[in-house]
Amino acid sequence: MENSNNTNIFIIFLSFLMIVLSITSIELPWQRIFLSGKFLGMKIFDLTVDHELFDSGIYYPTRLNEVWIEITSNSINNGIMTCMGINILSLVIILINPFKRFFKFISDSHYLFIEKILIRSLSVMIVIFYILSTTIGLMLSGTYCQVTKSSFDSTDGSTLSDESCYSLDMFSKSHIQDLVIRSTEVSSKPMKGWYLSIVLLFLSLILAVMVFIRFKRISPKLVDLGYRHYLTNNKSSSNNDTGSEVIGLSSNESDNIATVEIEPLL
């Protein structure tokens, strides 16, 4: 019982902490983070213009697709909001447990269903969703466009051709230059969003494990709920009936002892 209470306290603490982190990370500039091309200090996208390579006509990546940046930003924000909602839900369920007797509309079977199915399933689902949204978003956040010197020969800002650019959409020369300038400016600024995101992800994993351990002791069979409730209320009497009851019938002679075994009634 003490371990269960400690687990509940730890889950409540983690839930509050993750709710606070979720609120602070919702408004992070995810588009700027992706434009910086850095992940945990490692440069994953090279958006710096090398004029020597440019003049020689060598292909080099210059483009992050803003469509996927927007999708990724929304995906992460939705993941954070969903994570916060699940944490609040699990927190409410845990806090209601001691006061369950005051809620007449919540029966034991309903509460067992909420604990067993809802909390355990959603705690695992949120971690999977968060990992997928972050991983897929990171994979799709950037599409490289190979640009040659001839692609910039036109000064009217015309779109690039399919032969020189391999991306989901076409874009103009000024658009590329604007992206390069903005990415260079953003790269010089420290970005803490990824660190907060990673911390939130690990806390999600810890919380999911703790919730799974906490509610793993509950039997999934709802049909024996009444029988287990009876055993809980009659624990003191059931301890005496461990398997068989022995009645000793003794006579005046010490070696004349009769024993009778009575099978317990279930």
Curated annotation (Swiss-Prot):
Residue spans crossing the bilayer: 9-29, 79-99, 122-142, 193-213
Gene Ontology cellular-component terms listed: membrane
Keywords: Membrane, Transmembrane, Transmembrane helix
Membrane topology: Multi-pass membrane protein
Subcellular location: Membrane
Protein name: Putative uncharacterized transmembrane protein DDB_G0290203
Highest classification ranks of the organism: Eukaryota, Amoebozoa, Evosea, Eumycetozoa, Dictyostelia
